[in-house]
């Protein structure tokens, strides 16, 4: 935390930035955040393709249509988050989180899965709606971790949002701590059937931006460290290890 606050102090000492520097920095962040957050989840667009798509609306080389639409939608979600974060008098709501999710996914779609016995099953991913099926993940230690059940999710999300709003007003936690703990608690719930990682990273930047901290990019090359931090937080059943998610 001391190093983060030191870097934040250095950032403040550079303010205000020249207009051209601010524009260039915002554009760089927009490209880096969109590219890395999507690439971490399997999006196949290169950084160059992402740049051409988001800055000029052009596509070069072979590109998956779903990945193109996903990248454009994520950029819309980023802008939506920044607008909402600027409205500092408005508390966080579940409605906003669900709207952000709907923006990312755009519409409902069907997923097909091949089962071990060779048969195929399918289910619908609902944009903007909490999960209706259990979800889990294989952790870095090789164990299966079950997220909150569909039945528990609405109450847990209500608790999370209420906790955040109260903690923000109380002011006992720094924005860095708020963002890290919110991220961790959100990921433990995994409220949606898809898009949870992208929403979590958008919400981290929502909290940082809301408190006038620079937004962050978790790069694909740091994915292993990112997952280890979450695993360490799970093992500790607390919030402190999650602070290692934040790098300014």
Task: Indicate where each model-derived feature is located.
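FIC/Doc superfamily catalytic core
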Residues: 1-194, 198-247
């Amino acid at each position: 935390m001391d190093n983060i606050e030191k870097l934040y102090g250095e950032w403040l000492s550079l303010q205000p930035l020249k207009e051209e520097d601010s524009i260039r920095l915002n554009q760089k962040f927009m490209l880096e955040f969109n590219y890395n957050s999507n690439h971490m989840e399997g999006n196949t667009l290169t950084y160059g393709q992402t740049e051409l798509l988001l800055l000029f609306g052009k596509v070069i080389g072979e590109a998956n249509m779903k990945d193109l639409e996903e990248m454009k939608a994520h950029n819309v979600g980023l802008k939506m988050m920044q607008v909402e974060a600027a409205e500092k008098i408005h508390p966080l709501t579940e409605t906003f989180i669900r709207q952000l999710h709907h923006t990312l996914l755009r519409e409902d779609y069907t997923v097909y899965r091949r089962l071990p016995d060779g048969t195929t099953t399918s289910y619908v991913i609902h944009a903007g709606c909490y999960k209706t099926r259990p979800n889990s993940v294989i952790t870095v230690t090789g164990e299966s971790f079950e997220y909150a059940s569909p039945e528990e999710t609405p109450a847990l999300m209500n608790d999370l949002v209420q906790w955040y709003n109260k903690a923000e007003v109380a002011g006992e936690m720094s924005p860095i701590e708020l963002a890290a703990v919110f991220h961790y608690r959100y990921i433990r719930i995994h409220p949606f059937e898809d898009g949870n990682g992208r929403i979590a990273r958008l919400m981290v930047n929502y909290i940082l931006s809301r408190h006038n901290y620079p937004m962050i990019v978790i790069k694909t090359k740091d994915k292993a460290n990112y997952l280890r931090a979450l695993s360490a937080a799970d093992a500790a059943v607390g919030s402190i290890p999650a602070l290692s998610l934040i790098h300014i």
